[in-house]
From Swiss-Prot:
Belongs to the glycosyl hydrolase 13 family. GlgB subfamily. This is 1,4-alpha-glucan-branching enzyme. Pfam families: Alpha-amylase, Alpha-amylase_C, CBM_48. PANTHER family: 1,4-ALPHA-GLUCAN-BRANCHING ENZYME. The gene is glgB. The active site is at 338 (nucleophile), 391 (proton donor). Pathway: Glycan biosynthesis; glycogen biosynthesis.
Amino acid sequence: MTDYSKATDGTKVIHDDPWLEPYKEVIKRRHNQVKNTIQKLEESEGSLLKFSQGYEYFGFNVTKDGVNYREWLPSAHEVYLVGDFNQWNKTSHPLERDNYGRWSIFIPNNSNGECAIPHGSKIKIYLKLANGNFDYRIPAWIKRVEQTKENPVFDGVFWNPSKQYVFKNKSPMKPTELRIYEAHVGMSSELPEISTYSKFKDTVLPMVKELGYNCIQLMAVMEHAYYASFGYQVTNFFAISSRFGTPEELKEMIDKAHEMGLLVFLDVVHSHASKNVLDGLNQLDGTDHHYFHSGGRGNHELWDSRLFNYGNWEVMRFLLSNLRFYVDEYHFDGFRFDGVTSMIYTHHGLSPACSYDDYFGGAVDEDALNYLTLANVMLHTLNPSIVTIAEEVTGLATLCRPFSEGGGDFDYRLAMGIPDKWIELVKEKKDEDWNMGTIAHMLSNRRYKEKNIAYAESHDQSLVGDKTLAFWLMDKEMYTNMSVTTEETPIIDRGMSLHKMIRLITSSLGGDGYLNFMGNEFGHPEWVDFPREGNNNSLHHARRRWDLYRNPLLRYKQLRDFDIAMNKAEQEFRWLSSDFAYISLKHEDDKIIVFERASLIFIFNFHPSKSFSDYRIGSGVPGKFINVLDSDRKEFGGHVRIGKDNYHYTEDKPWHDRKYSLLIYIPSRTCLVLKKVD
């Protein structure tokens, strides 16, 4: 039998999973493709890290003598730089072409030493396309674009402020337990408006800190022409969204987050790009195969977007440099890679692909997998503390194992099956039909040594056509029965109870990190719907109702206080970085789940009506236990049926394959956490 424990050819992952052995040649081939690419980069570009600094060569780069502008446009016949600086003269500033399809121009300073292109002025390229026609385009590496109300097509903007923001704070140390707050700057205001980086800095960051999260994951930062795309139809990859403010204001916001001890992750979209031609990458040089695959392979029919050719040298440079740019320029601490499933399969995840034959079969786009691994290796070489998260739904084996062992080098994957299962349960199943084994399995089923970020709901579950978990649970009664001055109705009682239980069991059993979408911590009602023609361009559902939790007469504050207590308990006991939980009980009739993790005992009673006194549960260790958190406390909207200060003593009586056991009272629809104190 082969010993893979010391393998250096990419097959070390087989040591922990013998089921991978039949696919060892595929694993080796993929590993070698990455190694060979890195070697080629070292020979032709200096190194992978130097290759990722493309933004220092391409695009606009200001020197003491003037401005260099370079662009890769292999099929263009003529290229001219035009803008306010030359009164939009179409021929006064021609670019020169080299043998690799790279065009360049140097614009010297004015005679007085000032930059010839004024800061904030509009700028574009005018080029003779592959078909011989002339047209305007936005430079691919542009760092600023802006729209007007009259014209939704972006204009390029030359960004060169006299005073650039200087960071004052270093990034915090990477925590061993990630508690992620997913946020969208534009919809972070409680007013029906598009919010800003500055307002987010002043209002949302303090809330995130108070809630006990240690990381913010920012959506929709990369520029996108269509606001209602939620930021997932990117037009300009090096430009941050101008709707929310300036690059300097985003830097100040991130710097403030770092001062507060918060990491900041970017939701990066490299899985596809907007089809926009006039202000996007599409047909930049007049061809459909410039940055993308040609023909049908270059189009995502469901998303109506373009698909990158990850095997192209300059596409790799562009995307790797894009990641490096956000680290170097904006000090982002990590990335959530959007749409990884779509990237790594030629069917884009639209066909079932959840077996080893699928993971190592012919439907995998190995160029895309090669790019993703290179991206992770580059980022982790640049700074080992950078965190990378894959939005990947099929559970592709080895994706989150180190590259040195044969993996894709991601730090985490999103546990995307968990929120789908919760929504399925609350939508389709009666409480009496909830299966405890199914719940325990969906939360604990993850690959060995591949970390998961668990979540009960993210932005995906809140989009129009769906609704938040709280709204599924309580629906229209949230409009009329959330007041603490009126008697709690059965629907509100059930919804409040299950909302707390679902979040705690997801955090404590579901993974190695935890994520929450902004506002859902207090049971945000309704759904998210960005302004569009179908809703008369309304911002009513593209905001966060922070006023609901601030109102002491409403029950939202109780849900929020439970979330704070849950995060505080996690920070103290660190269950997210602890070993897998030991599940000692999944009782279908009693609707009870019991498990141990981080030296704590977690007890959940999902039964809609039955409470149990002197209920025996197992424990792996003997001693005296006390309640450190329960969902039935008054401050959390509970019924105060569980004593906070009562001690529970184990007995030398084996129970459910545990050496010891203890008796507890478990009211219906409650959860509690016991800590050993002696």
